[in-house]
Each structure stands twice: as C-alpha cells, then as structure tokens.
Curated annotation (Swiss-Prot):
Residue ranges of coiled coil: none
Family matches, as HAMAP family: UPF0181
Family: Belongs to the UPF0181 family.
Protein name, as recorded: UPF0181 protein YoaH
InterPro entries xrefs: UPF0181
Amino acid sequence: MFAGLPSLTHEQQQKAVERIQELMAQGMSSGQAIALVAEELRANHSGELIVARFEDEDE
C-alpha cells in the first residue's frame, strides 16, 4: 500500500507528539489520538507530501 504523507519539520512532529499526549491525558486511547492528529495534519497541511510504502504482510 502506498500513502501520501505530509512532510513535516521536526517542530511540526514535536507538536503532533505533544497533541497526541494531550489527547491521551484526557482519556483518549493512543490509537484514537494518533488517528485524530493524523487526520488534522492531513486537513491542515499545505506543504510537500512524501510517498511511503506500507507492507500489509509479514515476510
């Protein structure tokens, strides 16, 4: 599977981590927090995208 992912600076990555931690502190599961922050990043990102390939099967 290929996915277009936002290319983030270190500062943007750090803010995303802090946002995930904040949501988890409020009682959200880690999976939900990551999914929400990823959705927010995709919705608000205006920079470059990188292409990443994810393997669904174990080798």
